Structure formats: structure tokens, C-alpha cells
């Protein structure tokens, strides 16, 4: 995808197919950075 949101969503989708546990780590990291 050309958009940042689209690329982020695609990256999460790819991680989900590889290792669902990575999603939790990614989200936790994003929340920590945002918060």
C-alpha cells in the first residue's frame, strides 16, 4: 500500500501469518511509544 496506515496494516497482517504473538509485542510497543 502507498499509505502509511495501509503499510502498517499489511505489516501486521504479515506478522500475524508468521507468529501471532508478535502482534501483541508490536501493539504494546506502539502504545508505549504513543503514550
Curated annotation (Swiss-Prot):
It comes from the Eukaryota. Induction: By water stress. Keywords: Stress response. This is Water stress-responsive protein 7.
Amino acid at each position: 500500500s502507498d499509505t502509511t496506515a495501509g503499510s502498517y496494516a499489511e505489516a501486521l497482517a504479515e506478522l500475524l501469518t508468521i507468529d501471532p504473538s508478535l502482534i501483541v509485542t508490536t501493539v504494546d510497543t506502539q502504545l508505549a511509544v504513543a503514550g
